[in-house]
Amino acid sequence: MAYTEAEARKLVILAAHRLVDAGLTARTWGNLSARISDEQFVITPSGLGYDIMEPEDLVVVNISDLSYEGNRKPSSEKGIHADAYRLRPEVNFVIHTHQDKASVYGIRGWDLSGLTASILGKRVPCAAYGLPGTEKLRQAVADALSANPSSQAVLMKAHGALCLGADCESAFQAAEELEKACAGRVGEVLDEELSMYREQRALWPMPDYGRSQRKGHFFKLKYGSVTRIYDLRNVPADGSSPAAIHAAIYRSTKARYIIHVRSASTVALSILGKTVHPYLDDLAQIAGPDVRCARFFDDRRLPRAVSRALLGRNAALLEDCGGFCIGKTADDVTAAASLLEKGCEAALYAKLLGDCEPLSPVDARLQRLVYQAGYSHKKGKKADAQAQPETAAEAEAETETVCEAAAATVEVATEAAAEALREGEPACSGG
């Protein structure tokens, strides 16, 4: 039974916080919706942080044509939600997540089969790949839903998952059970490998390069049990000390926060000493079109090597020592660190399987470019997330980011940008 609009608005906000608390998403990633009638649902808006989202911020969307009410734009994945309600009359709550294990398992493009006594059904299909917000992705998910009428979830290759339920609780149960099932399958491949790296790290502890925050010419650095404040103007440009590395990064980027990431999967990839190409959309968007690895050729030049690896990116690896993430806010750098960990786990999983391909360079560069151009500036900003009501012509004419745009508009932008990239035009850089 559909919710009243007031019930749906309150429930979606509560569910958004629950989603973050359960570790099934972060920031504005993913989206949630609730059916309010046979013709409409309410959905989270585009680019607004869950921490400041309120019931009145949700958007009412019409299932038949995706038109919407109010002065906020709905999630770019509104079409996927509409299809879920259209194809599944019994569904009243939909959650799209970027949950870790389901995302990693989905990079192969395989269905999750062999499930028994599961709320998910006997099989969870994996929808074919499509760029976020595009008609291609929407159609792929709709095809998966149509072909698997008993499944309560759909994996989205290189992206995340869609979980359905007759109510909020059953949709959450589907998300949690999906994560548990995918963790088991991923663990069958990764657990032994990661255990070996953890044992090596215990025997030969790697340096802790710490985390820091910059204010003006000064930065506060904490590594191990040490916390100190440094003046950028007085830190030597060479040497392998944590302070020298952080200072070099601050001098060459616009970062305000830095974190040294030492998770098992990140360390494992750093030992290979190679550039990591993203297998997941969110890593390409947030970290960069690839994650370079700074090499340990000369301790004195290490700060420069790390800072150069981070140019135009928000994450880089350091050979044998994990990785570094940077951001303009504490939230940005924490998000980059969590995505680097998940992305490295996906890359290691792909390496061990041997039959997975990363995102194409065009898709990875395009997602990074459009994320920097728009979506990253909107997160957490209520004023920026608002939009004046548009006519159909205005909506068609507006160019938006892949993550935010209406599906048809993004499809056009995607093709144009991809063609430009194929012709060799440089992608924009940031840091």
Annotate each language-model stretch with its function.
Residues 395-399:
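Low-complexity, intrinsically disordered Ser/Thr/Pro- and acidic-rich segments
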